Amino acid sequence: MDYNRLAELLFPHINTTPEEMEARYPKRELPEGAKVTRMGPSPTGFMHLGNLYGALVDERLAHQSKGVFYLRIEDTDRKREVEGGVQMIIDAFKSFGLPFDEGATTDGETGIYGPYRQSQRAEIYQTFVKSLVQRGMAYPCFCTEEELSAAHEQQEKNKENFGYYGKYAVWRDRPMEDIEAELAKGTPYVVRFRSEGSIEHKIRHEDLVKGKMEVTENDQDVVILKSDGIPTYHFAHVVDDHLMGTTVVVRGEEWLATLPVHLQLFRAMGWKAPKYAHTAQLMKIDPETGGKRKLSKRKDPELALTFYAQEGYPVPAVLEYLMTLLNSNFEEWRRANPDLPMNDFQFTTKKMSGSGALFDIEKLRDVSKNVISRMTAEQVYDYVAEWSAVNDKEFNALLTRDPAFSKAYLAIGRGGKKPRKDLALWSDAKGYMDFMFDELFQPDYTMPERVSAEDAKAILSDFAGMFDENDTPDGFFDKMKQIASAHGYAADTKAYKADLSAYKGAVGDVSMVVRVAVAGRQNAPDLQTVMGILGKDKVLERLSKCADAL
């Protein structure tokens, strides 16, 4: 077989040599130990939590080592591509604050290792496929879908491995005359890699997450170039990761089965393969069966990245929670360093679990409460305003009508060793703040069991006469004690517990009456501070309305 002639028949338009192509992509000048990672999503219109999970690993490995994290759009499967898919990818990662150093952008790309869209790299791939044909390591295959299906059925009947190999690789050694005849007829074809592997052989490999392993050598003549001249993922990622200088490939463990193919292709090209980190799949406890299962696009809305923006999960909280899944020692570090930014944590693949990572949305809410509790009132206000401007315009108008008023309320209990943890989501803010706005105030005047309606009215009347918005919390409580004593309630809880029959109730019951009148509920932040923010007129108005309703 004249392989040079075959290569010219298949690629008459390719005049560039592999050496010339490689010269376009200089070796990266980076510090020793710097890692180059990439995110390579497909523009299918659906960005999921697994994408973010892997991207966080990519970003940390690169930026902790003073390396490069870039975005490459893997759009070789045109059937699955949706309009606007690339924009969705870029917007998703931008919203989660994962900074790419180079790669595809909204209006083009940045960096010297492009194009960063695989659909624009056809000449590059075909240059290297042509070189494989010239070396007798690749060949055209004219099999129809019907012929491939028939072979599959025969393999199933014979209980053989599926695929294109051995006697089923019918175009592997066909003579030039047969190839020329099909080309003359214009028969569509793909280009396959000529594998010299055997399933009898094992390859030793060390994965950054899974550790040392043995995998079966690839014996399949896989397709490397489709009939439209665009490569398959197998070949495209090998060429791109070599030319772009990728040193670590992070991907889901579902890709482990393709590892022998990729290692074989790197060897065939004479290139050093990057290190691979195959991450565990995200699992959850099925509420119906109680067993573990993979997160499902159909069953689990939390798989979609859009879910977190719509529900109002803080971006830092989502990232911190994912880090707890990625590194087993992160929670311990966070407890010891509550005020440090997450990026101060030294992430390592050595602490990643090789088995399924269990996603628990309630645990995410807990992490989110902790993250929000460490924020300033100004930060919380800004985030809630940003979220509500898109998702709850009515609340946004009230929140932003008087920023100082809203921030003053959000500042209650913030700071100190034990900050309040009322908010897990930005969408929780409306329910947390609603009683501060007359437009949302829907009071529940349910009083403590030990307080009669007559006593409640008297307590409210007394408090209205002595209310001072400038009181300290201690000053307010002293007044509660006075009112309690005047109406037969213990001014001291210990005294009440010592002789229950001597009192109607305790001072806590009295202060709860005022809390219910002002806040319209029994659970609210520090009442004296709340009343100071509402102002005297509003407090007296609410005391009066409550008394009238009893």
Predicted regions mapped to residue ranges:
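N-terminal Rossmann-like or analogous alpha/beta NTP/dinucleotide-binding catalytic cores
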Residues: 2-157, 257-271, 317
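A generic secondary-structure signal for well-formed alpha-helical elements
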Residues: 18, 93-100, 133-140, 152-155, ...
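Glycine- and acidic
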Residues: 37-44, 70-75, 243-249, 302-305, ...
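Residue-level signal for inorganic ion chemistry
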Residues: 58, 89, 132, 136, ...
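Glycine-rich phosphate/pyrophosphate-binding loops
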Residues: 63-77, 235-251, 272-283, 525-543
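Active-site cores that bind ATP or allylic diphosphates and position pyrophosphate for catalysis
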Residues: 139-278, 283-295, 304, 464-481, ...
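Catalytic adenosine-cofactor/nucleotide-binding cores of aminoacyl-tRNA synthetases and other
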Residues: 270-450, 519-550
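Helix-rich, typically C-terminal accessory recognition domains appended to large enzymatic cores
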Residues: 480-487, 491-534, 538
